[in-house]
């Protein structure tokens, strides 16, 4: 069996031995006296003997080390005392003075673990076998199974704080507030009612989106939520699923025998009729399986039609969830069609959009019509609905001063959720810009047709949305597209509600694969597989530009946008430049050169 190599620690100990300086008086006594090779006598360095016997190999190493140390010091001949006096000094070192001395090493091992005990040779250790090469140092960091592996391979109980940080980074989740629960990793871990989980499975929802992962656990704790996320991130289910879970926990006797038909238990507010209808469709899909009725209150419909709908809801004693726009809802309350005295669950979707559209006063009026928060836990309603306060969920793309005002006025200790790069350049949208130095309507129309035709050739089943700022421009574009055999539909404020719904349905089903619209359709309409958005006219507010192009590139798909600009759009150039830079997108050369005065 071959001899073991010498431990590096022991070699370093030998190399670290400090030479002992011999005073002149002792050197004189040890010399042979004057005249006997006195001129050639050199200074002798004495090294203390090591107590560790390393064998012949170690001796050779020690001799070499000592020789190396002595060779680095010049061999000085004896000289007159006058020339040596200024060099006469003596070091007096303590262990604490050694810069390499560490009384509390990062890792401390017992000597017998390493096979060395009381300075014994490695070859003389207790076991003296080759298996000693595989030592288990018992490092707690190396052997902590909780710190090994990705979070997706662990049980929920094994998740560490580090795992949760990585999880949130993976899904772009940021939160703000006190004692916010962890996001859910899957539907099964969400805590939702089993019937809701079964519905999710039957509808093919395999995994929650980031906003759903973050929002649902907070809502299930009956805590107010402010979610900052873009349209298309899955916000609808983020608030509908906790809402349905809440309804499933309401006292059964109240639901079956005491509930009044026109007293909804939950209210969802939306800025536009289109978004309200979209939310209604999603809520009805789940509500039918769970036994809850959904009613939409939007403009363009007769009040009698709404009343008939409520009366015809045979199952479940009337309406449970109301979805609508603020103005129409206020009218319905004033006409006694609806009563919100039992409505303890409020959702405001795209709240910033409602503020922009002038609904701030209507919002305040509606919220004040809801039951108050004070001392709910001591009331009968608190026991029936298992609540201590009213529950409010608000979703917005930006946190503006009016939004902050509403939050401070009506929400209690809310948890803030920020998803991904809300407000930042969208990574999966390829943005193109065409700057027209001279305004020529004919040239712009010609380029528009070429862009649409080129995109259609590359993507035969493509859905395209074209935005303009004015209704008459939309009508002109629609005629121009028809003349070039490009089927399209138009949506703007002058269209009736029935015409708008029919146009959207034709667009969704690809019967008319091009939609021409004003900003009324820019927010809230969730049409899958839109591959191109064209801004025939740049929006007057830059935020609207973000909402427009957000119609494409959804659910992880790639999308394109094409925007025409001219000098009249100069107010949007600076925010556009910052927007592109923040998202590490290419800034057009003309935008770099443009003199933004």
From Swiss-Prot:
Reaction(s) catalysed by this chain's protein: ATP + H2O = ADP + phosphate + H(+)
Chain ranges for the short sequence motif Q motif as given in the UniProt record: 185-213
Comment text on domains: The Q motif is unique to and characteristic of the DEAD box family of RNA helicases and controls ATP binding and hydrolysis.
Domain Helicase ATP-binding: 216-417
Name of the molecule in the record: Pre-mRNA-splicing ATP-dependent RNA helicase PRP28
Subunit structure as annotated in this protein's UniProt entry: Component of the U5 snRNP complex.
Record: residues binding ATP: 229-236
Compartment(s) of residence: Cytoplasm; Nucleus
Xref: InterPro entries: DEAD/DEAH_box_helicase_dom, Helicase_ATP-bd, Helicase_C-like, P-loop_NTPase, RNA-helicase_DEAD-box_CS, RNA_helicase_DEAD_Q_motif
CDD domains cross-referenced by the UniProt entry: SF2_C_DEAD (cd18787)
Start and end residues of each stretch annotated as Disordered: 21-83, 116-140
Comp. bias regions, Polar residues: 39-80
GO molecular function: ATP binding; ATP hydrolysis activity; nucleic acid binding; RNA helicase activity
Gene Ontology CC entries for this record: cytoplasm; nucleus
Residue numbers covered by motif DEAD box: 349-352
Enzyme Commission number(s): 3.6.4.13
GO biological process: mRNA processing; RNA splicing
Entry's family note: Belongs to the DEAD box helicase family. DDX23/PRP28 subfamily.
Function: ATP-dependent RNA helicase involved in mRNA splicing. May destabilize the U1/5'-splice site duplex to permit an effective competition for the 5'-splice site by the U6 snRNA, resulting in the switch between U1 and U6 at the 5'-splice site. May also act to unwind the U4/U6 base-pairing interaction in the U4/U6/U5 snRNP, facilitating the first covalent step of splicing.
Top EC class, one word: hydrolase
Domain Helicase C-terminal: 444-595
Organism: Lodderomyces elongisporus (strain ATCC 11503 / CBS 2605 / JCM 1781 / NBRC 1676 / NRRL YB-4239) (Yeast)
UniProt-listed Gene3D superfamilies: P-loop containing nucleotide triphosphate hydrolases
């Amino acid at each position: 069996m071959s001899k073991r190599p010498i431990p590096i620690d022991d070699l370093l100990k030998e190399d670290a031995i400090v030479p002992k300086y011999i005073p002149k008086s002792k050197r004189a006594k040890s010399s042979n006296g004057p005249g006997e090779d006195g001129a050639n006598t050199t200074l002798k360095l004495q090294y203390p003997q090591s107590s560790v016997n390393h064998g012949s190999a170690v001796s050779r190493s020690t001799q070499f080390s000592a020789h190396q140390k002595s060779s680095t010091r010049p061999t000085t001949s004896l000289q007159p005392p006058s020339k040596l006096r200024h060099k006469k000094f003596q070091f007096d070192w303590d262990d604490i003075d050694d810069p390499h001395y560490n009384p509390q090493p990062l890792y401390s091992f017992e000597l017998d673990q390493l096979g060395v005990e009381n300075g014994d040779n490695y070859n003389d250790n207790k076991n003296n076998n080759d298996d000693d090469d595989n030592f288990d140092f018992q490092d707690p960091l190396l052997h902590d199974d909780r710190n090994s592996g990705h979070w997706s391979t662990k049980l929920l109980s094994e998740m560490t704080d580090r795992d949760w940080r990585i999880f949130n980074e993976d899904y772009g989740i940021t939160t703000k507030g006190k004692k916010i629960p962890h996001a859910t990793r899957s539907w099964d871990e969400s805590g939702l009612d089993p019937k809701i989980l079964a519905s999710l499975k039957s509808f093919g929802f395999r995994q929650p989106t980031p906003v759903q992962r973050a929002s649902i656990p907070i809502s299930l704790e009956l805590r107010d939520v402010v979610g900052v996320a873009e349209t298309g991130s899955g916000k609808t289910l983020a608030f509908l699923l906790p809402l349905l879970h809440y309804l499933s926990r309401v006292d059964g006797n109240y639901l079956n025998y005491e509930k009044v038909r026109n007293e909804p238990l939950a209210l969802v507010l939306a800025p536009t009729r289109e978004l309200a209808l979209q939310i209604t469709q999603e809520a009805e899909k789940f509500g039918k399986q769970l036994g809850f009725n959904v009613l939409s209150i939007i403009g363009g419909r007769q009040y009698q039609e709404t009343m008939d709908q409520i009366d015809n809801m045979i199952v479940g004693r009337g309406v449970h969830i109301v979805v609508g726009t603020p103005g129409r809802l206020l009218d319905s309350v004033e006409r006694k069609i609806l009563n919100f005295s039992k409505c303890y669950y409020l959702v405001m979707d795209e709240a910033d959009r409602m503020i922009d559209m002038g609904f701030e006063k209507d919002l305040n009026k509606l919220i004040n019509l809801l039951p108050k928060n004070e001392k709910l836990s001591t009331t009968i309603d608190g026991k029936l609905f298992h609540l201590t306060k009213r529950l409010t969920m608000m979703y917005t793309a930006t946190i503006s001063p009016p939004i902050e005002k509403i939050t401070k006025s009506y929400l209690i200790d809310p948890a803030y959720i920020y998803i991904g790069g809300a407000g930042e350049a969208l990574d999966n949208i390829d943005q193109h810009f065409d700057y027209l130095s001279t305004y020529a309507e004919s040239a712009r129309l010609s380029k528009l047709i070429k862009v649409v035709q080129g995109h259609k050739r590359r993507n035969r089943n493509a859905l395209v949305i074209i935005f303009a700022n004015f209704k008459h421009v939309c009508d002109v574009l629609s005629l121009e597209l028809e003349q070039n055999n490009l089927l399209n539909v138009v949506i703007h404020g002058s269209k009736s509600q029935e015409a708008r719904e029919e146009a959207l349905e034709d667009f969704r089903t690809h019967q008319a694969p091009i939609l021409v619209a004003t900003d009324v359709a820019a927010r809230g309409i969730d049409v899958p597989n839109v591959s191109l958005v064209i801004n025939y006219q740049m929006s007057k507010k830059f935020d609207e530009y973000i909402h427009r192009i957000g119609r494409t590139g959804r659910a992880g798909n790639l999308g394109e946008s094409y925007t025409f600009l001219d000098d009249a759009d100069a107010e949007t150039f600076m925010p556009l430049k910052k927007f592109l830079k923040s998202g590490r997108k290419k800034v057009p050369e003309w935008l770099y050169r443009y003199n933004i005065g």
